[in-house]
Regions:
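A structural motif corresponding to the C-terminal end of an alpha-helix
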Residues: 90-97
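Flavin (FAD/FMN)-binding glycine-rich loop and adjacent Rossmann-like elements that form
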Residues: 14, 37, 41, 56-59, ...
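Short gly/ser-rich anion-binding loops that grip negatively charged ligand groups
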Residues: 27, 31, 73-80
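N-terminal capping segment at the start of a domain
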Residues: 45, 49-50, 58-70
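N-terminal FAD cofactor-binding segment of flavoenzymes
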Residues: 4-56
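Short beta-strand element of Class I
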Residues: 1
Length: 365
């Protein structure tokens, strides 16, 4: 297995992008819904210590009385660099070949299959022959290059400029601009956007402008903070654009926000709504692929969902759920349109994944 990583650390927006909140594995009313790799990665992210948020009611206790709708959800804050290195070590142990600074620029498609992916790196341009391809680019780049049907974000992305700092208040994460804050914590916030403009995120010139605006916003905030605290210094800024939604595949099924608590026979796991308490969604396997490119499967924030559902599915737990399903499927078949769904589901269950809400024995909420 070969992993192409455009950056020089693993983790994408969750590490290089400094969006270091591992959003909830639970539904917010006492029930864990995401398991398997989603939980493994959460625990790995804080295995050398959590930052700011630590859900003791989930990690240090099994008492359901401490997991009500009034209690802390199963989410954490982690150190991005520790998480990236720990993840790298896990991949190395698993025998994965990691190619840093390497990204796809084209795909050779023959008879509805990706025969090879053309990549560029410090080594120049190379061809990697493929049996199966998992597109976890976040921008559906492989799908786009291979000619699979895709959709782009209609609402665009608000400017963000998250950065870490050290000052008289200590070490902290400053969440400037777009923020992954649940509705219950967002009440009363009146801060204006950093810029009255949205970004699609799929053009080099536009993304470069976005990064410059982000850098300027960071510098302006530092100057403002230094008026009252001369010791205030930045300790880390994002080294990639803090884009949330850009492009996604049009799969065999498109999941919508209104399909909470709905049973799907081909479910490969469950996710919650990080923004509010209550909803549970089963994730259909048919949202991960298009039959037009039979050996391509999606993982992360570019699966087949409506615009309304996209904001739910773009976060780390959902990326882990779809990533585990996609990777497992890629090990079992070379044609995702002909996937033996029972074999896939059993393999996922053997790895600790719970597939259906009814298996939680909680009924409808």
């Amino acid at each position: 297995m070969t992993l192409l990583e455009k950056q020089y650390v693993l983790g994408g927006l969750g590490t290089a992008g400094l969006v270091t909140i591992y959003l909830p594995l639970c539904d917010g009313v006492g029930h864990q819904v995401s398991f398997g790799l989603a939980e493994e990665l959460l625990r790995l992210s804080i295995s050398m210590g959590a930052e700011d948020e630590y859900p003791a009611n989930w990690l240090d206790s099994t008492d359901p009385a401490g997991r009500t709708e009034k209690d802390h959800r199963f989410r954490v804050r982690y150190n991005p660099w520790l998480f990236a290195i720990l993840a790298e070590q896990e991949l190395v142990k698993a025998g994965v070949k990691i190619l840093y600074g390497c990204y796809a620029v084209d795909a050779e498609v023959r008879e509805d299959r990706i025969h090879s992916v053309i990549v560029e790196s410090i080594s120049g341009r190379q061809r990697i022959c493929t049996r199966t391809v998992v597109d976890a680019t976040g921008d559906a780049c492989i799908a786009h290059l291979a000619g699979a049907p895709t959709e782009t974000s209609q609402q665009g992305n608000i400017l963000a400029a998250w950065y870490y700092s050290q000052g008289s208040e200590g070490y902290r994460l400053n969440m400037l601009g777009f923020s992954d804050v649940p509705a219950e914590e967002d009440a009363g916030r009146t801060a204006r956007p950093l810029l009255d403009r949205r970004f699609g995120g799929l053009g080099c010139g536009e993304v470069s402008e976005m990064m410059q605006y982000s850098h300027a916003s960071t510098l302006n905030d530092i100057r403002k903070k230094r008026r009252s605290d001369p010791s205030w210094v930045p300790t880390a800024i994002a080294t990639m654009p803090q884009l949330r939604m850009t492009r996604r595949i049009q799969g065999e099924y498109t999941l919508d926000e209104g399909e909470m608590h709905k049973y799907f026979a081909d479910s490969v796991g469950m996710v919650s709504d990080w923004r509010k308490r209550g909803p549970i969604y089963e994730v259909p396997f048919s949202t991960l692929y298009s039959a037009k490119v039979k050996n391509l499967i999606m993982a992360g924030r570019c699966t087949s969902v409506t615009d309304a559902m996209w904001d739910i599915m773009r976060v780390i737990p959902c990326c882990a759920v779809t990533g585990q399903a996609a990777g497992t499927a890629a090990a079992l078949t070379e044609d995702f349109s002909a996937m033996d769904i029972r074999q896939l589901q059993q393999t996922l269950k053997n790895s600790g994944v719970i597939l259906h809400e009814r298996e939680l024995n909680i009924g409808k909420l």
